[in-house]
């Protein structure tokens, strides 16, 4: 199954990735792949995690995630081996995922709900702070204590890189950078719910 759209800038994107830059991948996946990613959580009868305002399904080794990961690593050799993936589906008007870091060398966050479903176009995006957790922090601090992260960011005075929501847009970045989902604002109706698909590549922060 072919999952990636044709593009001519893979070599340039891989160079950016190797240099540590945040890479934006618009029009990343083909229509069939997007349909599968979106509908398998829209129609899910069971979820793995329930949070305040959103739910998650884990994709540790499902065939579709593996195909996407393998194709991406062929195009972007700078990517480390695939670790895991998950999907989040949000209620229509809620807070986004709070500030945290992930134990990966790269995160790929892809948005799979069409733009026509968005209510407030100023919301639903992603904020990334080019700041790594202090070495003495534990997982419960860098992945479960957003207030402590906020204090660190305030102390360092670092500003976020902000990325607007766009259907079929992928954001590829150092997963250990602190990041958060912007507040969510989508139109009413189950089919309009904001769905994100996240892939983790490589490992860091945890031994």
Per-segment meaning from a language model:
Residues 2-96:
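Non-heme Fe(II)/2-oxoglutarate
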């Amino acid at each position: 199954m072919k999952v990636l759209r044709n593009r001519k800038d893979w070599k340039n994107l891989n160079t950016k990735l190797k240099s540590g830059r945040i890479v934006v991948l618009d029009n990343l996946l083909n229509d069939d792949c997007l349909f599968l990613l979106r509908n398998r959580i829209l129609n899910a009868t069971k979820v793995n995690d329930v949070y305040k305002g959103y739910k998650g399904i884990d994709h540790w080794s499902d065939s579709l995630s593996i195909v996407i990961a393998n194709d991406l690593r062929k195009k972007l050799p700078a990517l480390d081996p695939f670790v895991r993936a998950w999907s989040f589906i949000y209620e229509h008007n809620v807070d986004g995922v709070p500030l945290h870091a992930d134990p990966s060398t790269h995160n790929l966050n892809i948005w799979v709900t069409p733009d026509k479903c968005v209510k407030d176009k100023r919301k639903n995006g992603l904020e990334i702070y080019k700041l790594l957790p202090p070495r003495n922090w534990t997982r419960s601090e860098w992945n479960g204590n957003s207030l402590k992260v906020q204090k660190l960011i305030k102390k360092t005075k670092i500003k976020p890189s902000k990325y607007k929501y766009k259907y079929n847009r992928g954001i590829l970045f150092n997963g250990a950078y602190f990041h958060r989902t912007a507040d969510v604002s989508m139109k009413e109706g189950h089919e309009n719910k904001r769905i994100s698909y996240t892939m983790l590549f490589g490992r860091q922060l945890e031994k």
